[in-house]
Amino acid sequence: MVIDPVTLSQELISFPSITPTDNGAISFLSDILSQYGFTCHILDFGDDTVTVRNLYAYRGTEEGPNLCFAGHTDVVKTGDLTKWKFDPFSGHIEDDILYGRGAVDMKSAICAFIAAVSRINFNEVPGSISFLISGDEEGDHFQYGTPSVLKWLNENNHKIDYCIIGEPTSKSFLGDTIKVGRRGSVHFKIICNGIQGHVAYPHFAENPIDNMVSILYKICNTTFDTGNEYFQPSNCEIVSVDTGNTSRNVIPDTIVAHINIRYNNIHTAESLFDIINNICAQVTPKYQLLHSVSGEPFFNQPNQYSDMLSSAIKKVTGQDAIASTSGGVSDSRFIKNVCPVIEFGLKNETAHKIDEHVPVKEIYQLADIYTEFIKQFFNLSTT
């Protein structure tokens, strides 16, 4: 029986799987895929504070390539419920538009690929199709999601040959953008120290704010690069500055700033650390610099599979897709270490927003695109 991707999307949205809580979403998908002949492994990873539920499901033969669809069932918080037109977990359809948290990012894409798979005659598939579904991509415990599943796959001799991720990559219309790489993301914490004192007697104090302002000014006026053929220029944003000082007549002794740099493959996190460190040292010796990396940049050269996806998009929508590396980080930063990866999904305009929504027509189109891609990948009949 062929699955209706919109009905399935409504059902999946009804699970309030706010990261890292699963609330039954993974088991629901496991039950659906089991009915279609998939061997399903529900995988729980975590620590004393949290457990993240994930799913790996596969069907087919080990003789040929394994085409994997990767996604996540966790969603971000809803925000003020009174501002939503409809219950964000009702999967409500109004005027042929599906509303709900996860409608765009990215439950509908998961359902579209499941619908596509339900149309495939597996007797003709010279390989296997699999699903890698994470229960925490949006939150702080992502290490117990896709990275842990990939480790499990390696330990249990499951090999993925190519992966498509259903992140919402489209911008103005469905099919205008596919992701063939991602920028890196590095976060810096800058601490400047001074001497606390009374604002009326500044000569007895040392205000660390002055040095921090100078440091941030230099950073904001630094051209890290001008980009290249595949990536836009690296950019830096100040995300917070705080002294923790609530007194109006006290010069603080410490100030902390957080900055984030989204960077291309001209840099590494360490080369950017050197740049920021040198700027700080030019201003004052009284500083500390810490950094953490969310993901390094990567780029996949166009290949036969990305050409197949572009062809499938063209056939269904009539549009030519643009290959892009823009946007934030995704689980592709982990999967790219295992196999080539590409990302394609719905329009991202309302992702994470109040009244997140998608036209039902585009869910059907996405299922059609995924179906065509699967057929081309395995050289199946496209009639």
From Swiss-Prot:
Catalytic residue positions: 74, 137 (proton acceptor)
One Pfam short name: M20_dimer
Cofactor binding notes: Binds 2 Zn(2+) or Co(2+) ions per subunit.
UniProt key word Amino-acid biosynthesis: yes
Residue positions binding Zn(2+) 1: 72, 105, 167
Keywords noted in UniProt: Amino-acid biosynthesis, Cobalt, Diaminopimelate biosynthesis, Hydrolase, Lysine biosynthesis, Metal-binding, Zinc
Pathway: Amino-acid biosynthesis; L-lysine biosynthesis via DAP pathway; LL-2,6-diaminopimelate from (S)-tetrahydrodipicolinate (succinylase route): step 3/3
Reactions catalysed according to its record: N-succinyl-(2S,6S)-2,6-diaminopimelate + H2O = (2S,6S)-2,6-diaminopimelate + succinate
SUPFAM superfamilies: Bacterial exopeptidase dimerisation domain, Zn-dependent exopeptidases
Assigned EC number: 3.5.1.18
Cofactor(s) the protein needs: Zn(2+); Co(2+)
Alphabetical list of InterPro entries matching this protein: ArgE/DapE_CS, Bact_exopeptidase_dim_dom, DapE_proteobac, Peptidase_M20, Peptidase_M20_dimer, Peptidase_M20A
Entry keyword annotation includes Phosphoprotein: no
UniProt-listed GO biological process terms: diaminopimelate biosynthetic process; L-arginine biosynthetic process; lysine biosynthetic process via diaminopimelate
Signal sequence segment: none
GO molecular function, one term: acetylornithine deacetylase activity
Stretches assigned to coiled coil: none
Binding site for Zn(2+) 2: 105, 138, 352
Role noted for this protein: Catalyzes the hydrolysis of N-succinyl-L,L-diaminopimelic acid (SDAP), forming succinate and LL-2,6-diaminopimelate (DAP), an intermediate involved in the bacterial biosynthesis of lysine and meso-diaminopimelic acid, an essential component of bacterial cell walls.
Similarity-based family: Belongs to the peptidase M20A family. DapE subfamily.
Subunit structure: Homodimer.
Record protein name field: Succinyl-diaminopimelate desuccinylase
Organism name: Ehrlichia ruminantium (strain Gardel)
